[in-house]
A protein has these predicted regions:
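Hydrophobic, aromatic-rich transmembrane alpha-helices
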Residues: 213, 393-420
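Transmembrane catalytic cores of multi-pass membrane glycosyltransferases
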Residues: 1-3, 135, 244, 248, ...
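Membrane-embedded helix bundles of polyisoprenyl
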Residues: 38-51, 108-117, 167, 196-316
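Membrane-embedded, hydrophobic transmembrane alpha-helices
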Residues: 1-98
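Membrane-interface helix-loop junctions at the exits of transmembrane helices
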Residues: 45-48, 116-124, 149, 224-243, ...
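Extracytoplasmic
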Residues: 11, 17, 484, 503-666
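Membrane-helix boundary/interfacial segments in multi-pass membrane proteins
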Residues: 7, 56-64, 126-132, 239-252, ...
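Active-site lumenal/periplasmic loops and adjacent helix-entry segments of GT-C-fold
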Residues: 111-255, 523-534
Length: 666
């Protein structure tokens, strides 16, 4: 039951906030902001500690992580102390931002977090459920790999899907964290994954938006309240990332992006104003943060810098046009901001996969359709499943109102530019045909409109919150001005309370719109095991559940990973010849894969079977014919079915676990 996951979620919250809070203290992040930046810093500590431990050969565990993290925190504190002693002016704990009381965005985050947590629970169906997607076999198998090998390093985790399990880079921030929950709390891999999904969507995402809200100059309290409160009205995040892929690392990365952008907002303000006292603290926090984001998912870094780029350009323009600055001051500040721009462009250019990985997805909409869906948040519709969900008209209207509000006030116009820029990238991915331009613009997101659709939610939430808060504040001002002069103060005081309630009510109602309900239902279908499930149906799960009772721990099961059997490693803790659908089976199994039916006449087959203890073959169904071009690689296995080479051991419907009995006496 969900109640049984409460201790797991509480542990995850402590793990996500505790180490990062300590690092925030070491870096002298202001106390009022520290908790909201803590998760970003925690995931940096988790991923970097895993690399350090992997290099030293020390097994990954909660104790080893805490030990390395403590050393890293102490090193950061020591650096700040040394600099503060030598140059006190560079070690200030005062950061720029706004003067909105923290209670305002926190109150909004409590409501928004609760709504998204409830929505996400409905999306993932249950605490023991798992995503019926091909990529999820990698994510779940990676947790088993970490537990078995004691190595959680991003430098080696790619071995999970490598033919001979040779080390390869794969950003492991998500998997490192899930493995700590799994190994420490004694739960299942599926439940540890679901708990981390709930943490990312329902807690880290609104918390990250609080950090961002407190960084925006001249933001009004009602707007700071509305920004994290309104997130329940946007189903594309987390919904699309939970449905497609499945894209767990992107989910976590996007949840942390607002807090990293908030760091960049503060950094740009410091450089614009020449207030360098907080520069060291901000720069170190940004370096730690970018390490955390990159090791969760590199395109989270690209997403953050794309969002922040208009702000940096606006900062350069302000410095150049300023009449109050001397020429030397302009050059220094412009140079500092120019370095930030170079970093942004470098991230966008270099943090992208190869062309083959980036050129998979086709456009699904016309440019006009894509523009309409962007403006009214019908982002779930641009997919290969041809969904026709209702757009989020309320959220879209509030975002447009927020853009109009900023234009009218001539304030924070860079937020509109960020919204337009990210929206343009989504339109490119959803509507522009394959080619060099499409690759140039959206390759960091694999040209995948799902990833960019989920990213569009971030600027849309900001504008919708600003629009809602600005509208309610304008309504309050209009009412107060029409009250008798002696009663205006009382009307304004009472009205502010009413305005807070109104903002929260509208934010709550936004989560009840048809688009949210339709998306939630569609996502939940992907987490159910039924007789017609697309990756693992009930018969296949029956076979997998019996495997630990039949197959000895040290044996290997011959399989075709495209049929869902790749999940056996994570769910049944037994080794396979193929752990992922893109897995290239090791040449050491060549005779088995191609000549299994000839095991009684071809001695090489039984030699491999006995040498590698590959005494079993599992045959499941590939219901949707995933990877049709790859199926020829497994024809040799299918040809052995019905011969005297194989003996059925357990069956559920047509799904069968076989013993390669022809080799038992060889």
């Amino acid at each position: 039951s969900w109640l049984a996951t409460i201790p797991l979620l509480l542990f995850a919250v402590v793990l996500a906030f505790g180490p990062g809070y300590a690092m925030g203290w070491a870096l002298r992040i202001p106390a009022r902001l520290r908790a909201f930046y803590a998760p970003l810093l925690t995931f940096a500590l988790v991923a970097v500690s895993a690399i350090v431990l992997g290099k030293t050969g020390i097994p990954w565990s909660l104790i080893s992580f805490v030990s390395v993290a403590a050393v890293l925190v102490a090193a950061a504190a020591g650096l700040m102390w040394l600099v503060g002693r030598r140059w006190p002016a560079l070690a200030s704990a005062s950061w720029p931002g706004n003067d909105v009381p923290v209670a305002w965005p926190v109150a909004g985050a409590v409501l928004g977090g609760f709504l998204v947590l409830h929505m996400t629970e409905d999306m993932v169906y249950g605490p023991e459920a798992f995503s019926q997607s091909l990529d999820n076999s990698f994510h779940m198998n990676a947790i088993r790999w970490i537990q078995e090998h004691g190595d959680a390093s991003s430098l080696t985790l790619g071995a999970v899907s490598a033919a001979d399990q040779q080390p390869a880079f794969y950003p492991a921030g998500w998997h490192d964290f899930v493995s700590l929950i799994y190994s420490t709390m004694g739960t299942s891999i599926a439940t540890a994954t679901i708990v981390t999904v709930l943490l990312a969507a329902g807690i880290l995402w609104p918390c990250s938006l609080v950090a961002f809200s407190l960084s925006i100059p001249k933001l009004r309290p009602l707007q700071a309240l509305a920004i994290p409160a309104i997130i329940g009205g946007f189903a594309a995040f987390p919904g699309l990332l939970l449905r497609w892929g499945v894209l767990f690392p992107n989910l976590l990365g996007y949840a942390l992006v607002p807090s990293f952008v908030a760091l960049m907002v503060c950094l740009v303000q410091v450089m614009m104003r020449g207030e360098y006292t907080a520069l060291l603290s901000l720069c170190l926090a940004a370096l730690v943060g970018v390490a955390g984001l990159a090791l969760v998912h590199p395109n989270a870094v690209v997403s953050a810098v794309v969002f922040a780029l208009p702000l940096v350009l606006a900062g350069v323009a302000w410095v150049v046009r300023s009449r109050e600055l001397a020429s030397r001051q302009k050059w220094v500040r412009s140079a500092l901001l120019g370095l930030v721009i170079l970093g942004c462009v470098g991230a966008w250019w270099f943090l992208r996969p190869g062309a083959s990985a980036s050129n998979t997805w086709e456009p699904m909409l016309t440019e006009g359709e894509a523009l309409y869906q962007f403006l009214f948040l019908g982002l779930e519709n641009a997919n290969q499943l041809r969904d026709t969900f209702n757009p989020s008209y309320l959220a879209g209207f509030l975002a447009l109102w927020g853009a109009g509000y900023l234009l009218y006030k001539h304030r924070n116009l860079w937020l509109i530019a960020s919204w337009v820029l990210i929206g343009y990238l989504w339109i490119v991915s959803a509507s522009v045909p394959r080619g060099e331009f499409r690759l140039l613009m959206v390759a960091p997101w694999y040209t995948d409109h799902f990833r960019l659709a989920a990213l569009v939610v971030f600027p849309s939430v900001i504008l919708a919150g600003i629009g809602l808060g600005g509208f309610v504040e304008g309504l309050l001002t209009w009412v107060a001005r029409r009250a008798p002069r002696p009663a205006r103060l009382k009307v304004a005081t009472v009205g502010m309370g009413v305005a807070m309630v109104l903002v929260l009510v509208v934010a709550g109602l936004s989560s009840r719109v048809p688009s949210v309900q339709e998306t939630t239902l569609a996502v939940s279908q992907e987490y159910r095991v039924t007789p017609t499930s697309v990756v693992l149906n009930q018969d296949e799960m029956n076979v997998i559940n019996e495997i630990p009772k039949i197959v000895p721990k040290g044996d290997v099961i011959v399989n075709n990973p495209w049929d869902g059997s790749a999940y056996i490693y994570a769910l049944a803790d037994r080794h396979l010849t193929g752990y992922h659908f893109e897995f290239e089976t090791s040449p050491k199994y060549s005779a088995i894969m191609h000549n299994l039916k000839d095991a009684r006449t071809n001695p090489e087959v039984c030699r491999e079977v006995n040498k590698y203890k590959a005494h079993w073959y599992v045959h499941l169904e590939n219901q949707l014919n995933f990877g049709p071009d790859a199926q020829k690689n497994y024809d040799g296995l299918v040809a052995a079915i019905g011969t005297d080479v194989l003996t059925p051991v357990y069956s559920s419907g047509p799904m069968t676990l076989y013993r390669i009995s022809a080799c038992d006496n060889n």
